[in-house]
């Protein structure tokens, strides 16, 4: 069973991600945070197998949190953001800062199975992956 921490300021997006993953037998969403500040404690408390992270959030953004996580042996991070479309500067920066992969938030509903497959690859692979 893979434990997932979902970090996104949008309640709707968090609900979509949670539903996609909880429909799978091998995933369990152990925490859901609307900010980096809320997520920090959850990372230590729940020790997730994988983290999904939005980039554009109030307060501390996802890029800064990627930098924080880089110095710790935490779970792989899958960035889920409308800013990380394939080939975008934000996608490149997220990967450079330690994200395992990126997925375009706008594609979650249409390509939910691809998202789940990417999360599954992130927890089982140590190399950088490509997302939608």
Question: Where do the protein language model's features map onto the residues?
Answer:
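Receiver (REC) domain active-site loop signature in two-component systems and cognate sites
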Residues: 57
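Short amphipathic alpha-helix used as the core "switch/output" element in two-component signaling
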Residues: 63-74
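Two-component/phosphorelay signaling modules centered on CheY-like receiver
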Residues: 2, 11-31
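Receiver (REC) domain switch/output surface
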Residues: 112-132
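Active-site residues of response regulator receiver
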Residues: 8, 54
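Acidic catalytic/metal-coordinating carboxylates
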Residues: 35-38, 61-64
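Active-site beta3 strand of CheY-like receiver
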Residues: 46-52
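Alpha4 helix (beta4-alpha4-beta5 surface) of REC/receiver domains from two-component response regulators
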Residues: 64, 83-117
């Amino acid at each position: 069973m893979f434990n997932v921490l979902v970090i996104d300021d949008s309640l709707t997006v968090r609900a979509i991600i949670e539903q996609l993953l909880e429909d799978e037998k091998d995933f369990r969403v152990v925490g859901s945070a609307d900010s980096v500040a809320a997520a920090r404690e959850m990372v230590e408390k729940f020790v997730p197998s994988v983290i999904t992270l939005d980039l554009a959030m109030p307060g501390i953004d996802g890029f800064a949190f990627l930098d924080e996580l880089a110095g710790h042996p935490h779970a792989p991070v899958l960035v889920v953001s409308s800013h990380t479309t394939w080939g975008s500067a934000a996608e490149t920066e997220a990967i450079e800062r330690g994200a395992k992969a990126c997925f375009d938030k706008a594609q979650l509903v249409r390509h939910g199975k691809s998202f789940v497959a990417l999360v599954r690859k992130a927890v089982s692979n140590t190399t950088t992956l490509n997302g939608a």
